[in-house]
């Protein structure tokens, strides 16, 4: 049985140990690679201030790279009796290197270690989410251009209202993703600051070089105040969760639209048969389960900020074990969102559009505003034109050629997709993922 890093002479009650460890061994597997990267930067700094010899550093780096590779292969495990990933890595180093392995924790606490792991994990996941969003964005813009001349009804209060187009529909969700990415970018900038060196939350008497570890890990800056570095635990996760929830809100709305538009009562779009499921009793059914589940998963993700807020609510400054529970809802959320983005991207690329929706006379009245505007352009006061068209509708005399003449920015005839694409490109460039990627490659000795 492995000893705990804090092992005392009194044996802890087994039920207490089980309860306090909780799901940490499971959750910390998400953090294994990042814990190793943090340790590599930390020991490189320790050698620079004389707490490790060059030979000891070389030995530790060799073993840490080996542990990193095992985590990459999915072979890293946290043994029974070992509390967390930090303890497991130190245990492995001590088994392999003896006393040299015991030196790795100098100037460090599990408090700043887990905070560092979370930040390294989170910024990597934000990059992957951003890449998935960008892929969906390009599909939506492409479909917007492809179907820009196909009209569809626009709705207010779920009543037919005015002409819209599939160009507008696809493009609207593309532009929504641009704004969502601004939230994600803000979360990334907050996350991309180095907490290492704050130790238990009050710094260290070792002459740590925090600027060095900041550069080694590719952070933009560091959390300067060591007390605030620890106060950021919970706050960082909550703000990232808000960004994920914002994206989830867009995807949930898109999924809802797709479910409605795919139904026989609307018939605006058709999902590929291979993307639908059937019924055990009704042989004709082709259910949009993929979008129903996407909607549910995204609605669940929208509750994430509140869950984190309630766990961390009313905590004073300093570290508290309450924060451990946040990992259980926070760490898996990224994969859930990426799955939803991947499914949505695939379906949006394959979806078929009904190009003759407005041939149905039940949609005739959506052109009433077009007629009002035509009369107004010819000189009739708008309110008089409004009343005339209203009376024509009531009398059953209204007719229209079903043509639209919208030319202003962002309208049916002028989608501004190039401008929206430029906004997305500038937003993506603002993340500056290159710094973190290069730092990680350098630490691992990879090109």
Swiss-Prot record:
Keywords: Amino-acid biosynthesis, Arginine biosynthesis, Cytoplasm, Lyase. The keyword Transcription does not apply. PROSITE patterns: FUMARATE_LYASES. GO terms for cellular component: cytosol. GO terms for molecular function: argininosuccinate lyase activity. GO terms for biological process: arginine biosynthetic process via ornithine; L-arginine biosynthetic process. InterPro entries: Argininosuccinate_lyase (IPR009049), Fumarase/histidase_N (IPR024083), Fumarate_lyase_CS (IPR020557), Fumarate_lyase_fam (IPR000362), Fumarate_lyase_N (IPR022761), L-Aspartase-like (IPR008948). SUPFAM superfamilies: L-aspartase-like. It is an enzyme of class 4 (lyase). It comes from the Bacteria. NCBIfam families: argH (TIGR00838). PANTHER family: ARGININOSUCCINATE LYASE. Belongs to the lyase 1 family. Argininosuccinate lyase subfamily. This is Argininosuccinate lyase. It comes from Bacteroides fragilis (strain ATCC 25285 / DSM 2151 / CCUG 4856 / JCM 11019 / LMG 10263 / NCTC 9343 / Onslow / VPI 2553 / EN-2). The gene is argH.
């Amino acid at each position: 049985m492995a000893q705990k890093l804090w092992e005392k002479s009194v044996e802890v009650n087994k039920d207490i140990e089980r309860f306090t460890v909780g799901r940490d061994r499971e959750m910390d597997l998400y953090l294994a690679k990042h814990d190793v990267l943090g340790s590599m930067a930390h020991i490189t700094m320790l050698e620079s201030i004389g707490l490790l010899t060059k030979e000891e550093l070389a030995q530790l780096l060799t073993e840490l790279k080996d542990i990193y590779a095992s985590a990459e292969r999915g072979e890293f495990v946290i043994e029974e009796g070992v509390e967390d990933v930090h303890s497991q890595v130190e245990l492995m180093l001590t088994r392999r290197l003896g006393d040299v392995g015991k030196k790795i924790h100098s100037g460090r606490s599990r408090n700043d270690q887990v905070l560092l792991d979370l930040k390294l994990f989170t910024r990597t996941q934000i990059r992957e989410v951003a890449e998935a969003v960008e892929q969906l964005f390009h599909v939506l813009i492409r479909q917007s251009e492809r179907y820009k001349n196909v009209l569809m009804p626009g709705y207010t209060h779920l009543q037919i209202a005015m002409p819209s187009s599939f160009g507008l529909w696809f493009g609207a969700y593309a532009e929504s993703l641009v704004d969502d990415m601004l939230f994600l970018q803000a979360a990334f900038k907050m996350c991309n600051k180095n907490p290492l060196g704050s130790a238990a939350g009050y710094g260290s008497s070792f002459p740590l070089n925090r600027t060095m570890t900041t550069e080694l890990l590719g952070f933009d800056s560091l959390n300067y105040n060591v007390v605030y570095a620890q106060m950021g635990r919970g706050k960082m996760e909550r703000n990232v969760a808000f960004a994920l929830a914002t994206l989830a809100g867009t995807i949930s709305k898109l999924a809802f639209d797709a479910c409605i538009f795919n139904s026989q009562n609307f018939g605006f779009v058709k999902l590929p048969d291979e993307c639908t499921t059937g019924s055990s009793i009704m042989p004709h059914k082709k259910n949009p389960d993929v979008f129903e589940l996407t909607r549910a998963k995204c609605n669940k993700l929208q509750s994430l900020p509140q869950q984190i807020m309630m766990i961390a609510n009313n905590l004073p400054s300093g570290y508290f074990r309450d924060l451990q529970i946040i990992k259980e809802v926070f760490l898996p959320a990224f994969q859930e969102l990426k799955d939803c983005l991947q499914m949505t991207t695939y379906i949006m690329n394959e979806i078929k559009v009904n190009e003759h929706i407005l041939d149905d006379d039940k949609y005739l009245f959506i052109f009433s505003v077009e007629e009002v505007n035509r009369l107004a352009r010819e000189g009739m006061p708008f309110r008089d034109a409004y009343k005339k068209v209203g009376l024509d509708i009531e009398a059953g005399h209204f007719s229209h050629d079903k043509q639209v003449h919208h030319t202003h920015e962002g309208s049916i005839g002028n989608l501004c997709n190039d401008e929206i694409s430029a906004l997305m490109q500038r937003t993506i460039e603002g993340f500056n993922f290159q710094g973190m990627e290069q730092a990680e490659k350098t630490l691992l000795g990879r090109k």
